[in-house]
Amino acid sequence: MALITDIHTHSAFSHDSETDLKIMLSSALNKGVCFYGVAEHFDYDVLYGKTERELCIIDEENYFHTARHLQEDYAGVMNVLVGAEFGYTENENAHTMYKATVEKYAPDFIVNSIHTDNGIDYFFGEPYYTYVNGERVARPKKQAYERYLELIRRSLDAPYPYDIVAHIGYVTRYAPYADKRMPYGEYAEKIDEILLAIIQKNKILEINGKNFNSGKYVSATLPDFDMVERYFALGGRNISYASDAHAPNQIIEGRKEIVARLKAIGFTHFTVPCRGEYIKIPL
């Protein structure tokens, strides 16, 4: 029987979840998860150039203290990985804070993600717009999406450690366009640059199944499988599965279907990062 992994989940330590970490862990265990990765949001990408700690949403000391104790409680029963999701920004103050978090708390793994442009999350819509003669107008889709892909590529050169490259295609979730898709063929050059860098840097491409069965987003997975197929064709083999769960019912959502698709492409294992080691788990 294959071991079940879910690497990159959240709890109430993140600003967008209301579920206690203990409940998330209990639910994961009940669902048979063997490797469960907690990656709470460290949203230093919304600093707007400031350094005041009160702007940082997460209570990092409380999080790591609590999670490490729970990790000990589950030892021998479920492998709990205590990680962090670092929202990339070009803000050097944020880079310094991420480095300090790594040095002080040594997360088991780090997820590298793009949620924002100029400190504003795509969720709020602003990165899709510009101002012309004082009037707010939508950017052309290609311009907005290429800007997003450029940010991902820059994030791969982040001056702090990370293991997983998360949910490529996040920009499509909240886009105002009639056709929100970001097909590989239309952005091949920039996507190939990203995928090749992931391979060359020996990082892990995340297959994110958040809301897989809900039909809420244009893509059932991030990235779309055309990009995953291209990653495999380029030689990429390090992949991880993430439900990106923020509530118990979302844990391992879509995993069975995603595994079937990955096997059809030719993948044979997931890669689970833990303290610098890559653990290979058969699909």
Name the predicted role of every residue range.
Residues 8, 28, 110, 167, ...:
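Conserved, mostly hydrophobic/aromatic
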